């Protein structure tokens, strides 16, 4: 079944089919006569009179009116099998790492979420080894987690650290979707995973900044399809990482504009909620396995009320907000403990001790926040004795939330540390109960456990008891 191109407007192509027209989301193929390569289109609008409008998932250089277009009778499909592990692929599941072609069952990337009766809510905790996360925003296995932050506050570094820790500590499978981010960062991630030996348990799916919007909009679905294969057919618990889900929204905005839709609030596409739902509702735990999704979310102008971050918020189980002011203090990961939250930070899920320590930590930090204006005007000396103790402990908590990361070791010259959840709780419990009040503040900066704090204080000549 062939059609003929009747109009080309950048990545938007109109095609006339004399017989049956393709379905919406059906993939179409044509040969680019200039580049001698295949170009895939995706049907988006049925215009009537045997005409359809499609979006090109590749460069349209050399495409002209009159070229023949073939129907495939199915949506974009990718090969899924265990062969995809350790590989870097594009939106079509084709290798871009110079390796052999991947063999596997061709699976459509556009499909419905699993049946409701197969969904199993999971309340077990995914330990990350990162203190700020494990204490204040524990990740539910099989849940959806968002890393919110503006440009340059450390979202990508934190995602790379999570890949490292989950692969090394849990031996789990990771699927990484690079959506509209820098090619350089993708290359760094690939090299980092190669060097740390975790690449064999991971799949990287890239649709970077230089790709057409149609590609950037479909990369998360390709990554999801691969993750679903490992969950449904191999019974695995999969960590799905998306960097950056906001670029998916941006790509949808570009496609929507090209298709002539009237924009919604702040210029976003009118289908924003539907498009995000198509991705988020497929991230589920089932009776066979789970997909835990960690999504980096760029926050335009650090405004969390922007329609894109606000819509993403509604889908999440844990929200991790990265703060520019905390990053400027040199505390990494720059997690804002007062803005971040987790639905499973309750005694019935994490245990009474964990929930109580986390509550007291937040309480102390909130009290410190309320005292900051007084301190800046009058100084710490004018505070009551009780408030001075609170300030002392709050500063130690702030510094103890920092941690040397494995993926940043090359830049900081400080070896990375994985901190078990029990050690994290033990350390913060000691601070809030006043057991380490006489130790200097700088001993709490960029260390792992309480033992490391005492060792650092001893090295600095502090009194130990």
Swiss-Prot record:
Give the primary localization class.
membrane
Quick check: keyword Ribonucleoprotein in the entry? no
Q: What class of enzyme is it?
A: translocase
What the entry lists under Pfam families is as follows: ATP-synt_ab, ATP-synt_ab_N, ATP-synt_VA_C
Task: Name the membrane topology term.
Answer: Peripheral membrane protein
Its function, per the record, reads:
Produces ATP from ADP in the presence of a proton gradient across the membrane. The catalytic sites are hosted primarily by the beta subunits.
Could you tell me which PANTHER family the record lists for this protein? Answer: ATP SYNTHASE, ATP SYNTHASE SUBUNIT BETA, MITOCHONDRIAL
Q: What is this protein called?
A: ATP synthase subunit beta
Organism of origin is Dictyoglomus turgidum (strain DSM 6724 / Z-1310)
């Amino acid at each position: 079944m062939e059609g003929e191109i009747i109009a080309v407007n950048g990545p938007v192509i109109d095609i006339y089919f004399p017989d049956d027209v393709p379905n919406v989301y059906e993939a179409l193929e044509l040969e680019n006569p200039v580049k001698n390569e295949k170009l895939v289109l995706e049907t988006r609008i049925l215009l009537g009179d045997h005409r359809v409008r499609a979006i090109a998932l590749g460069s349209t250089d050399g495409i002209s009116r009159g070229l023949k277009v073939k129907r495939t009778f199915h949506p974009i499909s990718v090969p899924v099998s265990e062969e995809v592990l350790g590989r870097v692929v594009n939106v079509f599941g084709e290798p871009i790492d110079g390796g052999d072609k991947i063999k596997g069952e061709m699976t459509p990337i556009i499909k419905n979420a699993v049946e409701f009766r197969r969904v199993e809510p999971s309340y077990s905790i995914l330990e990350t080894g990162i203190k700020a996360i494990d204490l204040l925003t524990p990740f539910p296995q099989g849940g959806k987690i968002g890393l919110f932050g503006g440009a340059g506050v450390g979202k990508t570094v934190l995602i790379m650290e999570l890949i490292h820790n989950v692969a090394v500590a849990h031996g789990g499978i990771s699927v990484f979707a690079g959506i509209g981010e820098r090619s350089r960062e993708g290359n760094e991630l690939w090299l980092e995973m190669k060097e740390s030996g975790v690449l064999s348990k991971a799949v990287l799916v890239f649709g970077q900044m230089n790709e057409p919007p149609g590609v950037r909009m479909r990369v998360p679905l390709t990554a999801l399809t691969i993750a679903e294969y490992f969950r449904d057919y191999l019974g695995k618990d999969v960590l799905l990482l998306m960097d950056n889900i906001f670029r998916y929204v941006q790509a949808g905005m570009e496609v929507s504009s090209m298709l002539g839709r009237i924009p919604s609030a702040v210029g976003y596409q009118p289908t924003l909620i539907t498009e995000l739902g198509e991705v988020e509702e497929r991230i589920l735990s089932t009776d066979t396995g789970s997909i835990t999704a960690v999504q980096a979310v760029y926050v335009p102008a650090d405004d969390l009320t922007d329609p894109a971050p606000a819509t993403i918020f509604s889908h999440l189980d844990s929200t991790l907000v990265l703060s520019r002011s905390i990053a400027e203090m040199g505390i990494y990961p720059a997690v804002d403990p007062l803005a971040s939250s987790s639905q499973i930070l309750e005694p019935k899920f994490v245990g009474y001790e964990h929930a109580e320590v986390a509550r007291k930590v937040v309480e102390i930090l909130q009290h410190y926040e309320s005292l900051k204006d007084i301190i800046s005007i009058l100084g710490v000396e004018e505070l009551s004795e009780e408030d001075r103790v609170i300030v002392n402990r709050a500063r130690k908590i702030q510094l103890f939330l920092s941690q040397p990361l494995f993926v940043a070791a090359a830049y900081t010259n400080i070896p990375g540390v994985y901190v078990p959840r029990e050690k994290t709780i033990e350390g913060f419990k000691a601070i809030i109960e006043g057991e380490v009040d006489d130790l200097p503040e700088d001993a709490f900066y960029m260390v792992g456990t309480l033992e490391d704090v005492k060792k650092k204080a001893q090295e600095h000549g502090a009194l130990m008891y």
